[in-house]
Amino acid sequence: MATSAGKLRTLYSAHSSLSSLPPSARPTLQLATLRSYATTTPHDSPIGNTSNTPPTVKRPATAFKDKLNAGPAFSDFVSGKKDEPLDPAEAYALKTALVGPPGRKKEITRLPPWLKTAIPDSSNYKRIKNDLRGLNLHTVCEEARCPNIADCWGGSSKSAATATIMLMGDTCTRGCRFCSVKTSNKPPPLDPHEPDNTAEALSRWGLGYVVLTSVDRDDLADGGARHFAETVMKIKQKAPNILVECLTGDYAGDLDMVALVANSGLDVFAHNVETVEALTPFVRDRRASFQQSLRVLKAAKAAKPELITKTSLMLGLGETEAQLWDALRALRAINVDVVTFGQYMRPTKRHMAVHEYVRPDVFDLWKERALEMGFLYCASGPLVRSSYKAGEAFIENVLKKRRGENAGSVNEKVTTSENVKKLVAGEAMM
């Protein structure tokens, strides 16, 4: 206590002596005086004397700081302008670039410029997002962190706006090593209002093309096929002119359920093989297989021959050229009409690492090869996803042309529709 009082008296006397100094000299000395007492440690040096102050020791860089410096910057994900194309040397340098803190395992963390996208910003995008929240609907666009959400939801001069609705909740019973959707053995029960809510939302948006997909529901006896078919029928009732693509699971190999969905009134039946056969056990859930996916696509075409069938493959997982050729031949052998190629992008550190960032010219090459093999249409590029710009003008025109040619077979369509309704209701087909 005495020590504190002594310090205060010293400070007061020092302040009094300052008043006799010229104004220009006061601030520096006052600051030094106050600093000498603004500490809880003893300070035995004279007032204003800082010559004995120990030098500041610089803290070593932390592991966290190293990780931040090695990781991708914000500009690696978003770009407001179109990048100039890279020459082959620059592309190879990016492909082989390894970064990371010294003394640790290095990996590719910076994205090539062809994987940059614009920030979503359009009135259509905002309207769709608000309606989704209000009707408690999910989209694979958001759940799977798709980079094309701005293009699809906003539309373009070449194609109508599209959206991919994810049915049956946001929790999957499978755990594929490339997918960021939540997984659980016991997901929540189905929402009985979802078919009506989905149809209501789509009738508001004025979309030209919609993709319906779903999580896998191995906990349900029918895998959710009846729920899927009911949703398609509700949409067609409220918006008969909208084109509907269904990207389905494999229904645990139950081909009767595949036929049920194929006859529900959809325009495109899609089921993804995801990767080549050799990599399937390492990429997809153990309950899925390349051959089972082929059987699903074949059954859909058999149930409704005029139906467009579609599948998708990811590149950059370590597949070889020979394996890709084999996959395309197998798909053409069962008359798959449309195939898409896209770059695999690792959603989180818990998922499979990217083996390679495939150059855009390689995607162009595989598009040419697919079309030469007889595929009706092929979308191929680093940012292409299975439902990316599904409303492409070419597919829309093909579907509308087929719709006009088939307009005369009304009785056949009515009979099929009635049979599907009975199956959805749990009745036996007559």
Swiss-Prot record:
This is Lipoyl synthase, mitochondrial. The keyword Iron applies. Belongs to the radical SAM superfamily. Lipoyl synthase family. Binds 2 [4Fe-4S] clusters per subunit. One cluster is coordinated with 3 cysteines and an exchangeable S-adenosyl-L-methionine. It holds the Pfam family LIAS_N. [4Fe-4S] cluster 2 binds at residues 172, 176, 179. It comes from the Eukaryota.
